[in-house]
């Protein structure tokens, strides 16, 4: 039976009082914009005139002209035939002449007054000044996962972010909420087995969330003049706007920090796997290099929901990136006046291994996504804007309907009695110490799944034979290696998880999570100071209690037969003190 004690996971996050997001306006000029109608009419008139000049009958000339005009107004995936032909020709031209992408402007640091030496990184992106914030994990806690559902209280408050668009005397052009995450890491067999275990669960083991603030000096001339004018006034105004966003989110309990110039540059490079934009080749549906293939999608108008945002993370791949761009509706906001309407567009980028044989995983059609055909480079690499017709809009409060987790879910531990999968991080920067109290099988199962989500594990144990079997089955020394008690210091430097099984730890290793294995019954010795504690029931080995700073949650451990091959042949024994 599932038991929750002091664990404030919101199982029904939507209140009836939350306003709904609406699809963009769909008037006549939205359905048939002049940019489509006029060229189509001109093409139809030219075709009809040519038919008359060739002595065709009048009704034939009219039919030809009308048919050509109609053909030009019909849209396929929000694009008419003339746009498709134009994009095809432009794509061939770009690929023939090679990439001519201008390098991004260099980022620079601005000292933050009265902050003890903190710097804020800034860079220009065309007419916009960009600053960036990184969202930190508040506390380590379980995440509940269901098909197209992610339940966590550690989420980005989009409503508060939207209210930061229009400040006292400053207006931001946009706030991009950018989430990049991975389900699994590596190509070992344990990764494929873990994917089978996950099935349709939207489990993103690791997730980085950043907020990119876009400041338009032309829209804030008065505020800039009040702060000295020119470049200095522009920088001061952008810094003030950034600090106000940090302060407002911190008031809401969100840990955010400003990125320095070096970190801003590194974040941009990390999004492209440390490559330059010119290293990528554009195709009709993708951009790719020798190792990675990236596919871009937009969300159809009216389809943006928390269920869709969760379902995106259920698709296997190298990584997934989601960008929610919040912009004030032009008619409703200005400096000093709160925006009563906010527009939001969604970009989804799904990355796969370009060297993978056969068909690669794709976003399922039922999610309601639309491919960025012919526009992959402009949007994925150049940061171009998405068609405003795909935007949803509403008051800032309506964004409470969209759940954006602030951190990764970690690895799956088990399931609740009402069918939710339960995941919790067992390694990473926010997890310094983990305690597992129970049989060896439970610990090895958790280590196996940690490897599937990217952990590099070194084990110090008084029962090395039991661990050597698992290491041999994994078959990847960089992922799992076993050291004799007190040895293996040379391996610990590269490890992200160090397991001490019957061996006293040598102190905290930088960047590595320490996992202590305790014999059944050692509950009292395991609790103090640990970020996560897993306690196996003494009467039911399938029942595991998860303890974190947020509370206690008891779940049923879930395994699949493929995992048993790694675990069943391992000899079990009680760890002996070193």
Where are these regions (language model features)?
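Short secondary-structure junctions
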Residues: 166-172
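N-terminal alpha-helical membrane-insertion module
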Residues: 1-107, 422, 513-522, 528-541, ...
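Conserved P-loop NTPase "ATPase switch" module shared by AAA+ and STAND
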Residues: 476-508
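Membrane-embedded segments
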Residues: 160, 172-175
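Charged, often glycine-rich, active-site loop that binds/positions anionic groups
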Residues: 183-198
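Membrane-proximal, solvent-exposed terminal domains/tails of membrane-associated proteins
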Residues: 195-472, 487-491, 503, 513, ...
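Short, glycine/acidic-rich hinge or "gate" loops at secondary-structure transitions
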Residues: 174-182, 256-263
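N-terminal topogenic membrane-targeting module
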Residues: 71-160, 166, 408, 412-413
């Amino acid at each position: 039976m599932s038991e929750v004690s002091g664990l404030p996971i919101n199982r029904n996050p939507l209140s009836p009082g939350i306003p709904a997001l609406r699809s963009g306006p769909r008037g006549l000029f939205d359905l048939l914009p002049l940019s489509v109608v006029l060229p189509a009419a001109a093409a139809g008139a030219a075709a009809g005139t040519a038919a008359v000049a060739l002595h065709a009958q009048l009704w034939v000339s009219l039919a030809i002209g009308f048919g050509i005009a109609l053909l030009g107004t019909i849209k396929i995936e929000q694009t008419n035939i003339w746009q498709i032909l134009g994009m095809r020709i432009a794509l061939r031209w770009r690929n023939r002449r090679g990439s001519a992408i201008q390098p991004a402007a260099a980022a620079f640091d601005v000292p933050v007054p009265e902050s003890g030496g903190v710097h804020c990184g800034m860079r220009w992106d065309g007419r916009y000044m960009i600053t960036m914030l990184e969202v930190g994990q508040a506390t380590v806690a379980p995440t509940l996962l269901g098909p197209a559902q992610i339940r966590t209280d550690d989420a980005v408050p989009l409503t508060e972010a939207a209210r930061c668009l229009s400040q006292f005397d400053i207006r931001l052009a946009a706030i991009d909420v950018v989430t990049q995450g991975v389900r699994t890491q590596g190509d070992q067999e344990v990764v494929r087995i873990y994917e089978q275990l996950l099935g349709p669960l939207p489990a993103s083991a690791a997730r980085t969330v950043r907020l990119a603030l876009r400041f338009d000096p032309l829209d804030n001339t008065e505020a800039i003049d009040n702060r000295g004018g020119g470049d200095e006034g522009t920088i001061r105004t952008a810094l003030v706007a950034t600090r106000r966003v940090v302060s407002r989110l911190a008031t809401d309990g969100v840990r955010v920090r400003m990125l320095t110039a070096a970190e801003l540059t590194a974040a941009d490079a990390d999004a492209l796997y440390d490559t330059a934009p010119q290293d990528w080749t554009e195709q009709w549906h993708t951009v790719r290099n020798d190792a990675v293939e990236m596919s871009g999608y937009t969300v159809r108008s009216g389809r943006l929901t928390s269920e869709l945002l969760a379902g995106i993370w259920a698709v296997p791949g190298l990584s997934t990136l989601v960008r929610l761009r919040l912009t004030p509706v032009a008619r409703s906001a200005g400096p000093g006046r709160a925006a009563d309407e906010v527009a939001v567009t969604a970009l989804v980028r799904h990355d796969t291994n370009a060297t993978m044989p056969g068909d690669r995983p794709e976003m399922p059609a039922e999610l309601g996504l639309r491919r960025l055909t012919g526009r992959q480079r402009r949007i994925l690499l150049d940061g171009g804007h998405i068609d405003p017709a795909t935007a949803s809009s509403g008051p800032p409060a309506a964004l409470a309907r969209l759940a954006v987790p602030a951190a990764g879910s970690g690895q799956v531990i088990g399931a609740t009695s009402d069918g939710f999968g339960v995941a919790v991080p067992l390694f990473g920067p926010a997890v310094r110490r983990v305690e597992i109290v129970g049989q060896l099988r439970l610990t090895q199962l958790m280590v196996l799944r940690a490897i599937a989500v990217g952990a590099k594990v070194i084990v110090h144990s008084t029962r090395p034979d039991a661990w050597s079997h698992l290491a041999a089955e994994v078959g990847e020394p960089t992922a799992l290696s076993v050291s004799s008690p007190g040895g293996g210091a040379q391996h610990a430097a590269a490890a992200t998880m160090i397991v001490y099984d019957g061996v006293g730890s040598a102190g905290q290793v930088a960047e590595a999570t320490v996992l202590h294995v305790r014999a059944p019954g050692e509950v009292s010795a395991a609790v103090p100071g640990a970020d996560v504690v897993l306690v196996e029931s003494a009467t039911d080995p399938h029942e595991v209690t998860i303890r974190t700073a947020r509370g206690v949650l008891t779940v049923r451990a879930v395994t699949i037969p493929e995992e048993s091959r790694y675990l069943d042949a391992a000899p079990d024994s009680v760890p002996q003190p070193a």
